[in-house]
């Protein structure tokens, strides 16, 4: 059977045993990849600095997903929060990786068994003796089992009743830890940033799935609906399954890109909107203002800002700054962050405090402009010196650092002031090590960006696949060329055009 590459899956179209085999093999490949990728990431991951070199800066992709489900310790003796552990137990990062690889191997063997022993009695129709599947019944079984798993995850794992809970943090990603979560049954449960909604929605959706599964197991579909939706055709299953997958892919692409309780910034990095809206900058200024209100000096107030919070307020951690084909981690772009230099405050010779206008997300270069508290431009780094009116030299801009490594240090040298003004465009100023990884200085995206791009792309492809296979199963008779109302028996090969007696082939 000379099938083109895009039609090879027809070999399992009417072969339930081998259809099952290839799906088990697919599960083996998925689980095997997950386990292998986890081991690779653990081999290259450096857990020594969870504040300035967290998992998302290092380009970890599967470690954040394990962590948000409650895994925090390694058999290597380290914890994701920076401490050391003596008894991590079986469910460490390595334990999860190993269990996936073990499961993959078992699925591999099961796939081979089902490929060899394909002609099982369970796949045979008692009335006709031909291979067939009771698809509505199978749908009910799968719905019931997935509902059970969904309910169990929400009621036991997330709540901590039998399980660790999930990763929960504050709005600024500073105090995250794994903890049990109580279900949120009120209107607050619909807030995507409330962790309690994860528990309540899994419990509710799981209950619905269990009830719907029992319904489909006990009630047969009406004949008209069965025929109308082509429920006897395996391609209907393919089409509707693809629909479920692409819908889920669109949803998770959204929750990842825009942020939610399921995608904590400590594990996946901040969102681009937090940079666009000055989210962390506002919180930093609020904290400094609160410190000043308590009669602290500027230096004391800025010194109390957590380095972790300051690091979020840096454009290099914005996932939208990475280019489409810039492979690699954030660390291999602008370098490994070593320390916060402190917050620079610029002043002109009249003593006015000046603020550097920050670079918008989608700019690679941006003019250095310093404005006062009223938004009036007071200084800049001009493109043409001959025409300049507001140059650092003319205005007499000075800089002083508060907090961080340069706390209390001031500069009046124009070249130094301009250097730090350029860096202040990018948010808080950090010392970055570009030598260790030979970082090229070009921004990279975080796993948040990769996940979103991958899932949005595949969702679009799968949407097309749903339309394609849905059309094929609904209009199969039209595409085959056979009149559905044809009463006479059709002999394949007897006519040039299938089912058309006027095009009977001539005997040679």
From Swiss-Prot:
Its main location: plastid. InterPro entries: PS_antenna-like, PS_II_antenna-like_sf, PSII_PsbB. GO terms for molecular function: chlorophyll binding; electron transporter, transferring electrons within the cyclic electron transport pathway of photosynthesis activity. One of its GO terms (cellular component) is photosystem II. The chain crosses the membrane at residues 21-36, 101-115, 140-156, 203-218, 237-252, 457-472. It comes from the Eukaryota. It is a multi-pass membrane protein. Gene3D superfamilies: Photosystem II CP47 reaction center protein. Keywords: Chlorophyll, Chloroplast, Chromophore, Membrane, Photosynthesis, Photosystem II, Plastid, Thylakoid, Transmembrane, Transmembrane helix. It is found in: Plastid, Chloroplast thylakoid membrane. One of its GO terms (biological process) is photosynthetic electron transport in photosystem II. PANTHER family: PHOTOSYSTEM II CP43 REACTION CENTER PROTEIN, PHOTOSYSTEM II CP47 REACTION CENTER PROTEIN. PSII is composed of 1 copy each of membrane proteins PsbA, PsbB, PsbC, PsbD, PsbE, PsbF, PsbH, PsbI, PsbJ, PsbK, PsbL, PsbM, PsbT, PsbX, PsbY, PsbZ, Psb30/Ycf12, at least 3 peripheral proteins of the oxygen-evolving complex and a large number of cofactors. It forms dimeric complexes. Belongs to the PsbB/PsbC family. PsbB subfamily. This is Photosystem II CP47 reaction center protein. The lineage of its organism: Eukaryota, Viridiplantae, Streptophyta, Embryophyta, Tracheophyta. The gene is psbB.
């Amino acid at each position: 059977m000379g099938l083109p590459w895009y039609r090879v899956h027809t070999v399992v179209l009417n072969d339930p045993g081998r259809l099952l085999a290839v799906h088990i093999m697919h599960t083996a490949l998925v689980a095997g990849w997950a386990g292998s990728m986890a081991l690779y990431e653990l081999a290259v991951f450096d857990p020594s600095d969870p504040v300035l070199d967290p998992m998302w800066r290092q380009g970890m992709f599967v470690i954040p997903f394990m962590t948000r489900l409650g895994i925090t310790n390694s058999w290597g003796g380290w914890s994701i929060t920076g401490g050391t552990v003596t008894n991590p137990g079986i469910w460490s990062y390595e334990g999860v990786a190993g269990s996936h690889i073990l499961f993959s191997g078992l699925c591999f063997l099961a796939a081979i068994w089902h490929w060899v022993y394909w002609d099982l009695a369970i796949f045979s129709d008692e009335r006709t003796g031909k291979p067939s599947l009771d698809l509505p019944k199978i749908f009910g079984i799968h719905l019931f089992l997935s509902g059970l798993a969904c309910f169990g995850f929400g009621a036991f794992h997330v709540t901590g009743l039998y399980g660790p809970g999930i990763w929960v943090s504050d709005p600024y990603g500073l105090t995250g830890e794994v903890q049990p979560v109580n279900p949120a049954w009120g209107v607050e449960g619909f807030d995507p940033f409330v962790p309690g909604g994860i528990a309540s929605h899994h419990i509710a959706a799981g209950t619905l799935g269990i009830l719907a599964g029992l319904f489909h197991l006990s009630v047969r579909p009406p004949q008209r609906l069965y025929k109308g939706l082509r429920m006897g055709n395996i391609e209907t299953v393919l089409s509707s399954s693809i629909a479920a997958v692409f819908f889920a892919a669109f949803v998770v692409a959204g929750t990842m890109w825009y942020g939610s309780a399921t995608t904590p910034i400590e594990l996946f990095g901040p969102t681009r909107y937090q940079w666009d809206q000055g989210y962390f900058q506002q919180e930093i200024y609020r904290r400094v203002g609160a410190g000043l209100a308590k009669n602290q000096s500027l230096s004391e107030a800025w010194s109390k800002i957590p380095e972790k919070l300051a690091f979020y307020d840096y454009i290099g951690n914005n996932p939208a700054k990475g280019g489409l084909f810039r492979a690699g981690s954030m660390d291999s772009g602008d370098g490994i962050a070593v320390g916060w230099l402190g917050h620079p405050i610029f002043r002109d010779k009249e003593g006015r405090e000046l603020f550097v206008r920050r670079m918008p997300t989608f700019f690679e270069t941006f003019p250095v402009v310093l404005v006062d508290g009223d938004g009036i431009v007071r200084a800049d780094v001009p493109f043409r010196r001959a025409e300049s009116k507001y140059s650092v030299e003319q205005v007499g801009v000075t800089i002083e650092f508060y907090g961080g490594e340069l706390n209390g240090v001031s500069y009046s040298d124009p070249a130094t002031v301009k250097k730090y003004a350029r860096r202040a465009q990018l948010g808080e100023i950090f010392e970055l090590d570009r030598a260790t990884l030979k970082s090229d200085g070009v921004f990279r995206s975080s796993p948040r960006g990769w996940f979103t791009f991958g899932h949005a792309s595949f969702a679009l492809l799968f949407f097309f696949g749903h339309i394609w296979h849905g059309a094929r199963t609904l209009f199969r008779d039209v595409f085959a060329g056979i009149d559905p109302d044809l009463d006479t028996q059709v002999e394949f090969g007897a006519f040039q055009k299938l089912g058309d007696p006027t095009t009977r082939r001539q005997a040679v």
